[in-house]
């Protein structure tokens, strides 16, 4: 998926919950941005696509002071987790847990269910 198409999709899908979006990088199939939510938190998004499949992702949800709430990613460094490489950092970067949220849609569902 092209990053420009993905940005438009994100803007349309979550417009009512988003205060603003800051684009950090938009290049071919790579998208990096900060989504500022209306509750004062923000989500740092990085997605790298290979056609219709997401190859690499990270979604880091930060509180208004920019402290980590939850960070989801698929960096391949926790090989012993049952659903490697998918994992999340909860509260602290070293607090690693199994994650079944592997898309922005699933992450936003979690954020809007606990953060609002």
Residue ranges and their predicted role:
Residues 1-47, 51:
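Negatively charged, low-complexity tracts enriched in Asp/Glu with abundant Ser/Thr
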Residues 91-116:
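Well-ordered alpha/beta subsegment
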Residues 52-58, 78-88, 108-110:
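Short, surface-exposed linear segments at secondary-structure transitions and domain or protein termini
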Residues 70-98:
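Histidine-centered catalytic/metal-coordination loop motif
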Residues 32-35, 60, 84, 97:
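Short alpha-helical interface elements
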Residues 46-77:
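Short, conserved beta-strand/beta-arch hydrophobic-aromatic motifs that form part
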Residues 19, 62-66, 77, 83, ...:
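Short linear sequence elements within intrinsically disordered, low-complexity coil regions
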